[in-house]
């Protein structure tokens, strides 16, 4: 692919996987081992890039995400899968029910089937220091990072409908938890939520958060707009997820609205409402951690392989009858 000219047709593949994260590489591994001619289009922007380590994946607990993906690329290339660094900017379904995928380079590749694993982007609150510390001591997932920061002084920044749930959940890893309401008024919280927060021993602090306090390249506190500072060494925040559904929307895939964005309607294998198109990982749903994404990519690829097998057999039968 690296030698193709801009604007040219760069080949036909049995499957094109758009997205080179965990779900995409897992799908590509299955397809490569099934001897399917497969291309992975990898934009190189995995969701967990800010994190130094990933956790909760059996035998890979604590592995740096970049190292994990590099090993994944090495494995899939060993089965003849091609990987091109770039972005898929458009896709069109042709009259035969197959797909022409246009890359940012201007090249077009043809895919008999398509797996979309473009994931989502995390939109962080616009509080000074949050984006800069994200993945370090500003965290979003206690299952991913809670053990490493256990028993520290936790803060939770109210930013999404998940924030109260998050404040209750992180108490599993620390007895010192403060929920900063930020732009949420205390009377906006449900009575049941307030009772649960009190039962869990979570302190609730009203007032807008102005900035994070950092000293020696470590989070040391949370400063409110009124100037008061609360000592905290870890801040949990639930980013607003922004699904990358552009390609699926161009194909006319049916979407479902959730409190965390719009995602494609999929069956248990990841098949969307568009025949021949699967979605996996965070392209298919909000709460897909690395291990779930790998599983989703595997299921989509195995189903795609079987669907191609029977499509080719049925076509051979029709040709034989003619």
What does each model-found stretch correspond to?
Residues 1-13, 70, 79:
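Extreme N-terminal leader/targeting segments of oxidoreductases
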Residues 3, 132-148, 241-291, 299:
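FAD-site-proximal beta/loop scaffold in flavoenzymes
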Residues 13-67, 153, 162-187:
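Beta1-alpha1 glycine-rich phosphate/pyrophosphate-binding loop at the start
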Residues 21-22, 122, 161-162, 284-285:
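Residue-level detector of alpha-helix initiation sites
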Residues 27-29, 164-168, 280-322:
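A conserved FAD-binding loop/helix module that cradles the flavin
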Residues 33, 37, 43-45, 52-79, ...:
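N-terminal glycine-rich dinucleotide-binding loop that anchors FAD/FMN and/or NAD(P) in oxidoreductases
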Residues 70-103, 109-111, 174-262, 309-322:
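A Rossmann-like FAD-binding core segment of flavoenzymes
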Residues 123-168:
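Glycine-rich dinucleotide-binding loop and its adjacent helix/turn
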